[in-house]
Curated annotation (Swiss-Prot):
One of its GO terms (cellular component) is cytoplasm. The keyword Ligase applies. This is UDP-N-acetylmuramoylalanine--D-glutamate ligase. NCBIfam families: murD. GO terms for molecular function: ATP binding; UDP-N-acetylmuramoylalanine-D-glutamate ligase activity. It holds the Pfam family Mur_ligase_M.
Amino acid sequence: MSLIASDHFRIVVGLGKSGMSLVRFLANRGVAFAVADTRENPPELATLQRDYPHVEVRCGELDVEFLCRADELYVSPGLALATPALQAAAARGVKLSGDIELFARNAKAPIVAISGSNAKSTVTTLVGEMAAAAGKRVAVGGNLGTPALDLLSDDVELYVMELSSFQLETTDQLNAEVATVLNISEDHMDRYSGLPAYHLAKHRIFRGAKQFVVNRQDALTRPLMGEGQPCWTFGLSKPDFKAFGLREENGEKYLAFEFQNLMPVRELKIRGAHNQSNALAALALGHAVGLPFDAMLVALRTFAGLEHRCQWVRDLDGVGYYNDSKATNVGAALAAIEGLGADIDGKVVLIAGGDGKGAEFKDLRDPVATHCRAVILMGRDSDKIGEAIGDAVPLIRATTLVDAVAQCRAAAQPGDVVLLSPACASFDMFNNYEDRGHQFVRAVEDLA
């Protein structure tokens, strides 16, 4: 039985991927609804008109009077809740909600809920693979891959969900079995008033959670609320009670739980300290929902990482080339620079720049000075990054990604790595971060 009242009228606001999943969910349950989108030709309009021709749809500027016909608006995550028409509707008593809230009301299996500024997709995918290795019927999605509502099934034994701050803004009570915010650093400052507002949005993931997983190296990940729920921690330090971390024995580093060594770090296919942290976070989440260590370790030993996330491309003349195009904020770039920088004998030659989304870049200076041989700058906010780094290392300008890769090859020495980790969004020069990553890979593969 669907936990949704059928006597109310709803409007889906936003007709992208998640909006279309809402349309399917509501239509399949016979719920009365309409659709609105600020764009004249939203991405899923043709699909809506083909499959649901009787659903009313309004495209273009949002009409407050139209929105106020609804008892509830399901707002897609791409649309800011501060949009004046949405605020006007809310002021007149219309409830603002979203697909994750609706998913949580209807999910019958436990939910592993994962957010954070960085590493969400890697950890979400890894926990999903751990659950599959343990023989669980697992569904993985949310902000990653399949929209949440399309995952709902009576056959699912465990949901593993990546959730963005935008999705969490419209989620009142997730009621996850275990929830985590992996890390917090500035991101989406073009949408939030500052880090505190972004932090509060992320922490909505903990509402109703039965267990927490906390990064003990990032105080901002600790829940702001709690009533004695079990709390597991992860970090790169030595673990103690209810903690996952790193232990060293006879010169060998191990992933460990409490006082038990689980596996040598060298057996991980994913490189860098940041990926060791990701592995520990996944172990903590899996342990919280009862996944056996033997199955989780099988998944860890075979997991090779995700495309565009510190993805190894090739080695050439003693230099490794890595595609980290998904690093669309400073925190993600720092994780890659520090993680790879500490894992190699040489230095990092970094490609950075793009649309900075209003972020500050000053935190790049010291890690760049420590780990980088040179920085190749490109894109809209390259000057801002250059000002933040200053004279810490040589700065080289490039106008295209092909030019940037050529400059990297000239600057790199054997033992170095070339790293595309832009610390910026891609839309100033590319269709999306995937397009940027694919162009980088092609440029690297074309090197003779």
